[in-house]
């Protein structure tokens, strides 16, 4: 079992990003049997320039029997933009949803915070066990709910997409993500591998999710400006949203 260091990064990031990274890593370590996941060469730590400012990307990747890849990305652009991005990709032998979480923070505070357990099957539906567990969670109220992107049909009814305006709302967001992770890890530990046909359905669901996420023009534009089109495409398709083998 892999032991993960307490602080996922040495980058000076927004406090909410540090706190969320620690929540994510601690849940992984507490509930799952982690082992290292090797990223393509040269993509674990990346430095570049974006409009004259230094861009640093740090990636942490693990795997477990139920998850083929658990990816935590932390990025900083100059002194004005901090980013957290996390996705847990299920082992396609298991019929599990996709946990995803992102935070974007600037000098004015957190501009976007999103978390979801997104269906990864052709029907785009969560299982009864997930619906039952998630429906029992306390639903927090936030003052600034944001609209999902046009390609956002991959998200579940439990998706949280907000702009937190107070420390209290930031704490509520942290708790919600922790609740999602606890449910997800507990459900994963109780799950059993499915049939060959179910595996194909699971792969189709992950592929649909990844293709939709690859349409995120904002992420692609930032990467292209800093590293060029070819590198950006490689990073989008091999690190951020890689598709499992059939």
Swiss-Prot record:
Its EC number is 1.3.7.5. This is Phycocyanobilin:ferredoxin oxidoreductase. Gene3D superfamilies: 3.40.1500.20. Belongs to the HY2 family. Catalyzes the four-electron reduction of biliverdin IX-alpha (2-electron reduction at both the A and D rings); the reaction proceeds via an isolatable 2-electron intermediate, 181,182-dihydrobiliverdin. Pfam families: Fe_bilin_red (PF05996). GO terms for biological process: phytochromobilin biosynthetic process. It catalyses: (2R,3Z)-phycocyanobilin + 4 oxidized [2Fe-2S]-[ferredoxin] = biliverdin IXalpha + 4 reduced [2Fe-2S]-[ferredoxin] + 4 H(+). Keywords: Oxidoreductase. InterPro entries: Ferredoxin-dep_bilin_Rdtase, Ferredoxin_bilin_OxRdtase. HAMAP family: Ferredoxin_bilin_red (MF_00618). It comes from Crocosphaera subtropica (strain ATCC 51142 / BH68) (Cyanothece sp. (strain ATCC 51142)). GO terms for molecular function: cobalt ion binding; phycocyanobilin:ferredoxin oxidoreductase activity.
